[in-house]
Regions:
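Low-complexity, acidic/Ser/Thr- and charged residue-rich accessory regions of DNA metabolism proteins
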Residues: 335, 340-413
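Short acidic/histidine-rich active-site segments
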Residues: 214-230
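An N-terminally biased module of ancient metal coordination in phosphate/nucleic-acid-related enzymes
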Residues: 1-95, 100-103, 394-395, 404-409
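Divalent metal-coordination and catalytic microenvironments
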Residues: 10, 44, 87, 110, ...
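Histidine/acidic-residue-rich catalytic or RNA/ligand-binding cores of hydrolases
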Residues: 17-20, 51-55, 169-176, 207, ...
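Extended substrate/RNA-proximal surfaces in nucleic-acid metabolism proteins
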Residues: 4, 52-193
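Cys/His-rich short segments
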Residues: 256-326
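Histidine-centered divalent metal-coordination motifs
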Residues: 10-14, 163, 224
Length: 413
C-alpha cells in the first residue's frame, strides 16, 4: 500500500564530530514526530557503539525498515498522531584521496537494508582505517572503491554523493571535487542514481547541467542535532519498505519532490572570505580574479559560481520532468524573525511549542495549515511571515565561506 511521507535520510548521531549529545534514537524519534517526518536515516552506521545501540533500541519491521522499541518511546512522543518514525540504516563516509594528480575530498551517504549489512560493511571499512572515533569516518578510500565495496557487500545498498556542490567535501565541489560524476566513479558511475543537492543549491540550479539530467535529486538535513531534522527533506509516495525507498531513489518512482532551504541561506552560496566579511556574486568575484579585495588571498568559491562553471543551460531553465520542490524556512526561525528574539529564547520556544500543540507538526504548519488558524493561534505577524515563506515573497541575503545566509520575511522599508 502506498503511503505519503516525508523522509530525511542523511543525519548524524551524537557519535559524529561536532554534534549534539542529544542525538539518541529516542530523541531522533521524538523530533521526527514533532516535525512530521515519517522516515529518517539512522546516521553513522559505521560507528560500533552506535550500531550496538541501534540493535538494542530499534526493532525490524521485516521490510528493511526499523522503528523504536515501544519501551524506548518518550511519553511526550506519544501525543503526536501517526504510527511513529521509521528508520533506515544510513551513514556518511568522508573519503580523502589522490586522483588524477589532485587531492579529492568527497562525502558519500550510504543506505542499507539491514543492521546485518551494516555490520558487514563496517567490517570491511575497518580494514581501511579508524571507524571508532568519528561517526562520519575519514578514510583514505577512493569513492569508486567505496561504491565497489558496497556493491560487493550488499548489492541492494544505495550510495548517494552528499551535498554535491559544497566547496570542500563533495563530488563536484570547487576546492577538491571533480568536474563530473563519471570522473569520480568511472565505470561504476551507472550505479549512482541520485545526488543530494545540499543546502546551498536547489533543484533549479542543478537543472542547468544537462549531464545531471539522469539523476534523481534528493534533499536531506545533514542534521547534527535532532532539532535540525527536516531542514531539507524528500516528499515520497511509496510502499513503506526499503524496496519502496530503493525504487524512489534509484528510479524516481514515488519520489514526488523535495523540501528545500532557500539556497541563499546555505553556508556556501556566494563566493567570499569570512575573515574579511567579503561576500560576492559570481560576476563580482570574476571581476576581481577570485581574489579577496581586503587581504589579497584567494576567495572561497561558492556553489552559485561552481554551478555557473559547469552549467550548459541558462539560469531559469526548467527541466520538463523535474520534480516539484518547496523552499521553506524552519518554523523557529520564522517566529524568531517575527518576534525579534533569538531562536533559543524562551519567548520563541514557547510560541513554537504552542503552535505545535494547537495546530500540528512543524511541516503541517509551514506547508498546510490555513493562515487564519495560524493567525488566531500566534498572531497576524507570524501568520504573515509563514505566508511570505510559502509564496517566496522574501528577501535573500546569500551565505558565503561557511557563514549562513539570511532570509528576511518582511520588507521593513
Amino acid at each position: 500500500m502506498l503511503m505519503k511521507m516525508i523522509a530525511d535520510l542523511h543525519i548524524h548521531s551524537r557519535f559524529s564530530m561536532a554534534t549534539s549529545k542529544e542525538g539518541t534514537p529516542e530523541n531522533l524519534d521524538f523530533w521526527a514526530r514533532k516535525k512530521g517526518i515519517s522516515l529518517i536515516g539512522t546516521g553513522d552506521f559505521t560507528h560500533p557503539v552506535w550500531r550496538e545501540e541501534l540493535k538494542e533500541r530499534l526493532v525490524s519491521e521485516g521490510n528493511g525498515l526499523y522503528r523504536l522499541r515501544d519501551e524506548y518511546v518518550k511519553e511526550e512522543s506519544r501525543k503526536f498522531p501517526g504510527e511513529g518514525t521509521r528508520f533506515v540504516v544510513s551513514g556518511e563516509i568522508s573519503s580523502i584521496y589522490k586522483k588524477n594528480g589532485k587531492t579529492r575530498k568527497v562525502h558519500n551517504v550510504i543506505l542499507l537494508p539491514s543492521l546485518e549489512a551494516a555490520d558487514a560493511m563496517a567490517q570491511r571499512l575497518e580494514k581501511i582505517g579508524n571507524i571508532h572515533s568519528d561517526g562520519r569516518p575519514i578514510l583514505g578510500l577512493d569513492s569508486h572503491d567505496l561504491l565497489e565495496m558496497m556493491l560487493d557487500v550488499c548489492p541492494e545498498g544505495i550510495l548517494i554523493p552528499a551535498h554535491i556542490w559544497t566547496p570542500h567535501f563533495s563530488v563536484l565541489g570547487a576546492k577538491s571535487g571533480f568536474d563530473s560524476v563519471e570522473e569520480c566513479f568511472e565505470e561504476l558511475a551507472p550505479y549512482i542514481h541520485a545526488l543530494e543537492t545540499g543546502l546551498s543549491s536547489d533543484p533549479a540550479m542543478n537543472w542547468r547541467i544537462s549531464k545531471l539530467d539522469r539523476y534523481q535529486l534528493v534533499s536531506n538535513s545533514d542534521a547534527h542535532s535532532p532539532s535540525k531534522l527536516g531542514r531539507e527533506a524528500n516528499l515520497l509516495d511509496i510502499d513503506c519498505s526499503y524496496e519502496g525507498l530503493y525504487r524512489a531513489i534509484q528510479t524516481g518512482e514515488g519520489l514526488e519532490g523535495t523540501v528545500e532551504f532557500f539556497p541563499e541561506e546555505g553556508k556556501y552560496h556566494f563566493d567570499g572570505h569570512r575573515k574579511c566579511g567579503v561576500s560576492l556574486s559570481p560576476v563580482e568575484a570574476e571581476q576581481l580574479g577570485g581574489i579577496c579585495p581586503v587581504c589579497g588571498k584567494k576567495l572561497t568559491m561558492g556553489v552559485d559560481h561552481r554551478v555557473e562553471q559547469l552549467a550548459d543551460r541558462a539560469e531559469g531553465f526548467v527541466k520538463k520532468d523535474g520534480k516539484k520542490y518547496e523552499s521553506l524556512v524552519p518554523l523557529p526561525e520564522v517566529i524568531s524573525t517575527c518576534m525579534g528574539y533569538s531562536t533559543a529564547s524562551k519567548k520563541v520556544q514557547g510560541c513554537f511549542e504552542q503552535l505545535i500543540q494547537t495546530l500540528g507538526t512543524e511541516f503541517d504548519i509551514l506547508r498546510n495549515v490555513p493562515s487564519e488558524d495560524i493567525k488566531s493561534c500566534a498572531g497576524e505577524r507570524i501568520a504573515e511571515g509563514i505566508e511570505n515563506v510559502r509564496t517566496g515573497n522574501v528577501k535573500r541575503i546569500p551565505g558565503y565561506d561557511g557563514e549562513y545566509g539570511k532570509i528576511e520575511l518582511f520588507d521593513e522599508n
